[in-house]
Amino acid sequence: MQSKNMIVASSHQQQQQQQPQQPQPQLKCPRCDSSNTKFCYYNNYSLSQPRHFCKACKRYWTRGGTLRNVPVGGSYRKNKRVKRPSTATTTTASTVSTTNSSSPNNPHQISHFSSMNHHPLFYGLSDHMSSCNNNLPMIPSRFSDSSKTCSSSGLESEFLSSGFSSLSALGLGLPHQMSHDHTINGSFINNSTTNKPFLLSGLFGSSMSSSSTLLQHPHKPMNNGGDMLGQSHLQTLASLQDLHVGGNNEDMKYKEGKLDQISGNINGFMSSSSSLDPSNYNNMWNNASVVNGAWLDPTNNNVGSSLTSLI
C-alpha cells in the first residue's frame, strides 16, 4: 500500500512541473494607468519594496513608496545656465576707454603762455593789454606772433610801471611816483628788439640774488635827484619768468647758464663795493644809463667787466 501511495505522489509532482507556470498579473502604472510594466529589482535589495518600470511613460515607481513627479530623463535636475547680456560688458569697456582718452598724456605739462586765458589785472596790468593777446616783453620773439599790431615798447613800459606801482601798494616803503617819474628812461626800453629779451632776462636774473640787500635800503639817490631803481623792484617780474615754456631744451639750458653767469658777476660787483655810499650808486647808474641809444659805454673804466657782459 505504501509503495502505491509514493508512486501516485511522484506522478502528481511531475504533472505540476510539466504544467506551465502562470505569469504573475502585471501591475498598472500609477502615473499613466498602463499595464505595460515590468518588474526590475527590489529597492535596496529588500523584498518589501519591489521596483517596477513603466514602458509607456518610461518612468520608475516603487511599490509602497511615494511617487515623485520626475520627467523622463530627469532634465529638471540639470542647472540651467543663465546667459548674461553682453551690453553690460560693452558699456564698462566704453567707460574705461573714455576715461583713458580724456586724461592728458602729461598732467604736469604747462600749456603755452599765450593760450592761458588769465585776465591782465591778475598781473597788475591794464585792460588794454588783453587786446595784445598777452604778448609780454619777457617772451622772446619766436614765442609771440610778429604780426600783432600792438607795440612792444608800450607793453614793456606798461608792464614795468604796473610792477613798480604794485610794489608800492604792498607797503614796502616805495614811492608811487616811480612808475612814471624816475623809473627807466624811454630810450632804455626803445632799444633794438633783438636785445630786449636778453636785456630783461639779465635784469631779472640779477634781481633775485641781491633783492634782500636792496630792500634794506629802498631809497637810494639816482640821477636827476630821483630815487634809485633797485633790483628788488623787478622781483615781482622775475616770478613770471618761471611760467615760460621753451620750445627747445638746448636753448633754455644755454640761456639759464648765461643768466647764472650774469647774476654771479653782478653779485661780485655789488659785494666788492666798499660801502653803501650814495655816490657809488650814482656812478653805477650814470654809467649804465642810456646815452644816445647805447646801452653801455665799454670805454668807461669805472664800470667793471660784469656790466659789459650785458651787451
UniProtKB/Swiss-Prot annotation:
A zinc finger (Dof-type) spans 27-81. One of its GO terms (cellular component) is nucleus. Zn(2+) binds at C29, C32, C54, C57. It holds the Pfam family Zn_ribbon_Dof. The keyword DNA-binding applies. One of its GO terms (molecular function) is zinc ion binding. PROSITE patterns: ZF_DOF_1, ZF_DOF_2. It is found in: Nucleus. Keywords: DNA-binding, Metal-binding, Nucleus, Transcription, Transcription regulation, Zinc, Zinc-finger. Residues 1-12 have a biased composition (Polar residues). Residues 13-26, 85-107 have a biased composition (Low complexity). Transcription factor that binds specifically to a 5'-AA[AG]G-3' consensus core sequence. This is Dof zinc finger protein DOF1.4. It comes from Arabidopsis thaliana (Mouse-ear cress).
